[in-house]
Amino acid sequence: MEVLDKAVNGYIDHLLGPKDPRVRGWLLLDNYVPTILFTALYLFIVWRGPKYMQNRPPVSCRGILVVYNLGLTLLSLYMFYELVTGVWEGGYNFFCQDTNSGGDADTKIVRVLWWYYFSKLIEFMDTFFFILRKNNHQITVLHVYHHASMLNIWWFVMNWVPCGHSYFGATLNSFIHVLMYSYYGLSAIPAMRPYLWWKKYITQCQLTQFVLTMTQTTCAMIWPCKFPMGWLYFQNCYMISLIILFGNFYIKTYNKKTSSRRKEYQNGSASAVNGHTNSFSSLEDNVKQRKQRQD
């Protein structure tokens, strides 16, 4: 393992240059191998998990899901608050912010973004709960790609650009996750389901987030500072991939639903729905609708 660590990290250091000394010795950041292994284990469970559960009854994780989603809601709220206040204290420039001119605020941003990176490891549990509950239709290419890639991307971000212009996407994403995980936590409580109407708008907010992140990243390309240009190009390419995948999800999920309802009304037989769907819910007249979770 030590030989592998040296080989992998030596190659990365040669390719990208020296790491930011502020994160030296931080949990999971010194070596890339643990992040690779966590990702490989995640992908293995995605592959083997549904097969393992195929002839087994689904596991009801309702109580655990409430606690899990509440925990991620609070963590996301903490990160959003700390990032916003850190950016304000450091007088960050929206158009371009380097990684060394914010003073103590940079240190605060680095600390919060480590938690953001670590939260991507915690969020692997999203997929594991799908597998245990046999909601395999929710384990999509979008879902797996987004979860697996974010952990790895943020390992690199934390080691080379752990503050400065990196704050923007994480700040928006933390806010979106407050909405998203509060929704999924509440959806695990039967009495709350009739009041949950905003799932569609979460996807719209995510798409808006990607567009805003691309806009802010492009600003740094047009009015550059000392933030590495290569990271900005990569960020925009990644945002484009997410816009394509999330946009495809949105069109298939919500446009199809609208078209289906229009046909039902034209036939004079519109069916009643309760305003939301989730893996626990069942609709009236034994009509069951299943939608993919987008993140």
From Swiss-Prot:
Superkingdom of source: Eukaryota
Molecular function via GO: fatty acid elongase activity
Membrane topology: Multi-pass membrane protein
Compositional bias of kind Polar residues: 266-284
Localization per Swiss-Prot or TrEMBL: Endoplasmic reticulum membrane; Cell projection, Dendrite
Known EC number: 2.3.1.199
Catalyzed reaction equations: a very-long-chain acyl-CoA + malonyl-CoA + H(+) = a very-long-chain 3-oxoacyl-CoA + CO2 + CoA; (6Z,9Z,12Z)-octadecatrienoyl-CoA + malonyl-CoA + H(+) = (8Z,11Z,14Z)-3-oxoeicosatrienoyl-CoA + CO2 + CoA; (9Z,12Z,15Z)-octadecatrienoyl-CoA + malonyl-CoA + H(+) = (11Z,14Z,17Z)-3-oxoeicosatrienoyl-CoA + CO2 + CoA; (9Z)-hexadecenoyl-CoA + malonyl-CoA + H(+) = 3-oxo-(11Z)-octadecenoyl-CoA + CO2 + CoA
Pathway named in the protein's UniProt entry: Lipid metabolism; polyunsaturated fatty acid biosynthesis
InterPro entries attached to this UniProt entry: ELO_fam, ELOVL5
Skewed-composition ranges (Basic and acidic residues): 285-295
Region: Disordered, residue numbers: 265-295
Record keyword Endoplasmic reticulum present: yes
One CC-aspect GO term: endoplasmic reticulum membrane
Keywords recorded for this protein, A-Z: Cell projection, Endoplasmic reticulum, Fatty acid biosynthesis, Fatty acid metabolism, Lipid biosynthesis, Lipid metabolism, Membrane, Transferase, Transmembrane, Transmembrane helix
Presence of keyword ATP-binding: no
Cystine bridges: none
Transmembrane annotation, as ranges: 26-46, 64-84, 112-132, 150-170, 175-192, 207-223, 227-247
Any one GO biological process: unsaturated fatty acid biosynthetic process
Physiological role: Catalyzes the first and rate-limiting reaction of the four reactions that constitute the long-chain fatty acids elongation cycle. This endoplasmic reticulum-bound enzymatic process allows the addition of 2 carbons to the chain of long- and very long-chain fatty acids (VLCFAs) per cycle. Condensing enzyme that acts specifically toward polyunsaturated acyl-CoA with the higher activity toward C18:3(n-6) acyl-CoA.
Family: Belongs to the ELO family. ELOVL5 subfamily.
Name this polypeptide is given: Very long chain fatty acid elongase 5
Native species: Xenopus tropicalis
